[in-house]
């Protein structure tokens, strides 16, 4: 489901983590350089484990951004109320009056009109969404590379609302691995093999092979129905709609000469591993790397991933009823903010925070589970890494 935009969803500008006392002395770091910072991103005590989820203790954080053309001429309160609707207008009025929102380091009146290129800072109590409690298992470790089994629901690196509840953040808290350079991405709900370089030189080595088309990758998926026994190659363009957060596939050969095909070229090879008549296990080898490529190409074949919340709806008459049945059967779990209300013994409650005393951020309520798509192998010139199959990969 879609959530109202929070500042956490804004990747523009600069951000820094701070404490209430050290707010003026903490080091500023660019979002792009966050992975390469020598300071600790996370520590073990940052996490709370409850109800099958890994939560992050809320912490103070300062967002820094610069006034762009669209913002210029707005009052400071209108800017935040219009651009970041995840908090009510009254909150922003209070934040400006109290100095939690500043312009060029100065407290300004609520009627202040912002000007181009001014620096705006917002000091707030940050709550991150929870992730599934599964460990980040180290599969293979060398001086210049480490491979892990990424659990579903955990982003690879800091982005959007996630910072500490990421693979990079969890590894920083639980293992002394130093600087980390993830060399490829997996969607948040996808699990499996993740390769992480430990030196810039090794990261560049992998990058050159990936960009040169020298790397092969393989996933497994659990799909609806009896997948064809013969190998199937899907060659269909993928068009990603950022506002909807989903992709569509279109076959260039069936579009007609007078119709322009949307999206980018994409190709995936599928091979059936097993079937029980209701579901099939399928080996998936993406030749290209488009957004949601495997998921949308499987939907295109008529055999979508059997628990895919985005691409299953066209193949289930009543998706809400289907999900409800799986919840009743214990196959899915609902995470709701109302399930997690804590006291000051668990974390410091901020009187101005719109999330406290709840642990989960406002607007977060999802049917969060492991998507039945798992990366099992990456191989290139002179190297190969694998990841064991997940528990759902049986029929």
From Swiss-Prot:
Entry keyword annotation includes Lipid biosynthesis: no
Protein name in UniProt: RNA pseudouridine synthase 7
Domain S4 RNA-binding: 74-136
Keyword Signal recorded: no
Source taxonomy: Eukaryota, Viridiplantae, Streptophyta, Embryophyta, Tracheophyta
Stretches with biased composition (Polar residues): 244-255
Chemical reaction(s) catalysed: a uridine in RNA = a pseudouridine in RNA
UniProt similarity note: Belongs to the pseudouridine synthase RluA family.
Domain of life: Eukaryota
GO biological processes: pseudouridine synthesis
Enzyme Commission numbers on file: 5.4.99.-
InterPro entries associated with the record: PsdUridine_synth_cat_dom_sf (IPR020103), PsdUridine_synth_RluA-like_CS (IPR006224), PsdUridine_synth_RluC/D (IPR006225), PsdUridine_synth_RsuA/RluA (IPR006145), RluA_PseudoU_synthase (IPR050188)
Pfam family, any one: PseudoU_synth_2
SUPFAM superfamilies named among the record's database cross-references: Pseudouridine synthase
Origin species: Arabidopsis thaliana
Top-level EC class as recorded in UniProt: isomerase
Active site: residue positions: 187
GO molecular function: pseudouridine synthase activity; RNA binding
PANTHER family cross-referenced by the UniProt entry: MITOCHONDRIAL RNA PSEUDOURIDINE SYNTHASE, PSEUDOURIDYLATE SYNTHASE RPUSD2
Ranges for region Disordered: 1-21, 244-263
Keywords of the record: Isomerase, RNA-binding
Paired cysteines (S-S): none
